[in-house]
Amino acid sequence: MSFPYSLKPFNTFGVEQSCLSLIEVHSKAELQSACLSLYQSKRPMLVLGGGSNIVFTDDFNGTVVRVLSKGISCSEDDTHFYLAVEAGENWHELVQFSLNQNMPGLENLALIPGTVGAAPIQNIGAYGVELCDICDWVEYLDLASGNLLRLTVDECEFAYRESIFKGSLRDKAVITAVGLRLPKAWQPKLAYGPLQSFTAETVTPREIFDRVCEVRSEKLPNPEVLGNAGSFFKNPIVSAATYMQLAARFPSIVGYAQPNGEVKLAAGWLIEHAGLKGFALGNAGVHAKQALVLVNLGHATGQDICRLALHVITRVNEVFGVKLEAEPRIMGLTGETSLDV
């Protein structure tokens, strides 16, 4: 079977796989039309944003729909700014836009790769802020009915790297636009690492933005130089009792207390202290500067990356008794599959 359309330019791991057909949509109407037609034909379909959260382990025997719809509209009331953003907008460019319009609140989420439409699926987050903190609504195409529907932030069932779009609406919905709600009474979020040196009373949104960009650029390799999908593993959440046991054995372990009493562990710390920082398996490697990131060292296949990920998961579990979970979607011949190759 022939797969004439290369997907290498459209996935940040730079994996060389192809697909049967490729459609680029530049408006919400085109996105609706293309996705409904494909859904009704019952052919495999993959809706792709920036390709920054995906690992292709095979050619895709179906149609890839690249979402390139653009548009940002702004409004406000006495207390909030509101942004309605089309799914194909670049996330980091949206962060820059909001700052330039003096609408702060997104600065902690600077330099997260990908599109706005992909952001709600895994409830993107960084440096103490998650999408759910600033999301107002999510509009999506209901594939079964063909209708555009809108969910409130509560209806999205957001959790750490989770949402209804990974749950009951998986494969049933295509996100078309996202609404954001930014308080005019801006309050800096400075709880995490490199932001703790700032003073809440004097820091500006631009200073936070610049620091986040600086730190991410230092730690995360440029995908155009070294293929990667950013953080490959979720930070595991454990009980307070488990954390205390681990801290007794590993006093320098990094953990962040959660509102419900559980503790979020730093997956990068676990990987590094399992001796895997800079480790390579074939053409896939654990990044030498940030162990949370897996990289394509040159001509790695999706299978290479998955094999390395499974090795990391096994080793961390052996050392710490903690099971890591992969963040990216693993795409096989006809659709999403599991990490096991």
Curated annotation (Swiss-Prot):
GO terms for molecular function: FAD binding; UDP-N-acetylmuramate dehydrogenase activity. Gene3D superfamilies: 3.30.465.10, UDP-N-acetylenolpyruvoylglucosamine reductase, C-terminal domain, Uridine Diphospho-n-acetylenolpyruvylglucosamine Reductase, domain 2. It comes from Shewanella sp. (strain ANA-3). Residues 15-185 form the FAD-binding PCMH-type domain. Its EC number is 1.3.1.98. Cell wall formation. It catalyses: UDP-N-acetyl-alpha-D-muramate + NADP(+) = UDP-N-acetyl-3-O-(1-carboxyvinyl)-alpha-D-glucosamine + NADPH + H(+). It is found in: Cytoplasm. This is UDP-N-acetylenolpyruvoylglucosamine reductase.
